Structures are given as C-alpha cells and as structure tokens.
C-alpha cells in the first residue's frame, strides 16, 4: 500500500498526457487538502487501466480542483471529466471545483451515457465557473436549473462567482 499521511499536496502548472495509463490525477482516500490547479490534461492515448474513466478521480476530502483544462481528444476511456468517489466511509467529501474547462468531443460516452462534468454520487461538492464543450464552443455548466445535465451529484452546492 501507500502511506495514508499524504495531506496538503499541490499539483500545479503540470501538463499530463498523452499516453497516461489511468487517471491523470488520482487523489486517494484518507488524504486531505489536495489542490490541483493550472494543469492541462491530454486524454490522447489514455488506456483506462484500473477502470479509469476521468481526468481526475477524487477520493480524498477537502480537495480543490481549479483553473485546469482537459482535452478528451477522442479517448473513449474518458467517460466524464471528474469523478468523485466515497470508497471509504466519510471520504470523497467537500470538494471545491471551479474555473475549469473541459473539451469532451461528444455529449455521450462510449457506453452511450451522458458525458458529465462531475460524477459524484453521495459525495459533497461545491462548484462554480466551470465550462464544457462537446463539439464546438465552451458553455457554462453552472446553471442550477440544468444541474442534472452536467453534474451527477446529489450533494451539490453552487458557490459564488
């Protein structure tokens, strides 16, 4: 295993990809305070190893995901931009996700399901100022009336812009 005392890490100004085997960033359970900011994710050649389906997988608490850009680039392994999981009781909570832009190529994934910006069932997240493009221009995904179009999250809060 790995050491669980891996808190308050910052991943900043990185270009990750192409040819990444699994998620570009995988924030593990039992970690707190991870920040991922100002990074670029290139999905080209991602193999989807270990069931990877997103640019970022959040399993830790109190994470900040901000000002990143993700390009799916036709990679069928990427089925959503960000995944948030509670694989251990009390974990995968309190994420702040804002100022991100993702280019997903299509509105549906390889399984014919909706291409969500954030998939985070039973995980709390606060979001604002996020944008997505399917096959064209970026659009805001932060309209509360359309939450279920872009955020598959039953514990979602919209923050202030």
Segments (PLM) and residue ranges:
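A short, acidic, flexible beta-alpha connecting loop/helix-capping segment that sits on the rim
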Residues: 144-146
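Right-handed parallel beta-helix
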Residues: 1-26, 31-46, 53-55, 60-74, ...
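Structural detector of coil-to-beta-strand junctions
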Residues: 22-26, 47-48, 53-55, 76-86, ...
């Amino acid at each position: 295993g790995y050491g669980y005392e891996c808190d308050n890490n910052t991943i900043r100004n990185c270009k990750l990809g192409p040819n990444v085997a699994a998620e570009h960033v995988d924030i593990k359970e039992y970690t707190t305070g991870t920040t991922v900011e100002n990074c670029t994710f290139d999905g080209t050649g991602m193999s989807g190893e270990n069931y990877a389906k997103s640019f970022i997988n959040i399993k830790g608490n109190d994470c900040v995901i901000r000002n990143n850009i993700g390009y799916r680039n036709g990679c069928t392994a990427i089925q959503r931009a960000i995944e948030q999981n509670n694989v251990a009781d009390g974990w995968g909570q309190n994420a702040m996700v804002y100022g991100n832009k993702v280019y997903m190529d299509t509105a549906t994934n390889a399984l014919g399901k909706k291409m969500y910006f954030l998939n985070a069932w039973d995980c709390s997240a606060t979001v604002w100022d996020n944008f997505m493009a399917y096959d064209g221009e970026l659009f805001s995904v932060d309209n509360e009336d359309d939450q279920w179009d872009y955020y598959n999250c039953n514990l979602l809060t919209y923050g202030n812009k």
